[in-house]
Amino acid sequence: MSRLMIIGCGGVASVAIHKCCQNSDVFTEIMIASRTVSKCDALKEKLQGTTKTKITTAKVDADNVDELVALMESYKPDAVLNVALPYQDLTIMDACLACGVNYMDTANYEPEDTDDPEWRAIYEKRCKDCLLYTSDAADEA
């Protein structure tokens, strides 16, 4: 039914990937992408035989928008789940916006070098303009 790209392969990512694989009727294909592809491959091997979900892996630098865009254009996911570092949220969001791919996140972006809340309003507007943003929770906050 859907193709999910999961960016990150640390502790939180491993739990999220296991849970997604338990729902193979929803997530029929998953790509695990991280800077350390050997971790992705090891998790894929561990999961094979326990799920009907088709799992692929890839190496990606989550700080590099062009690399993220290229991977998204190649894999064509329906959605991206970001379980990488919170400092990488905006580059991953930029790539999703460029590709028109839905974005999910388990963390809250924290600018590494600044305390500027303006970024949130800017990205919410961009997502609404691309019809990728459907939550009313931010409007109520």
Where are these regions (language model features)?
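Conserved N-terminal Rossmann-fold NAD(P)-binding element of oxidoreductases
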Residues: I6-G10
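N-terminal Rossmann-fold NAD(P) dinucleotide-binding loop
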Residues: A13-S14
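Helix N-cap at the beta1-alpha1 junction of Rossmann-like dinucleotide-binding domains, i.e.
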Residues: T36-S38
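Rossmann-fold cofactor-recognition segment
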Residues: T51-D63
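N-terminal glycine-rich "phosphate-gripper" loop used for MgATP/nucleotide binding
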Residues: D61-A62, D78-M93, G100
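Conserved Rossmann-fold cofactor-binding substructure of NAD(P)-dependent oxidoreductases
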Residues: A62-S74
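Rossmann-fold NAD(P)-binding glycine/threonine-rich loop
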Residues: N108-L132
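Single conserved hydrophobic/aromatic residue that forms the stacking wall/gate
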Residues: Y133-A141
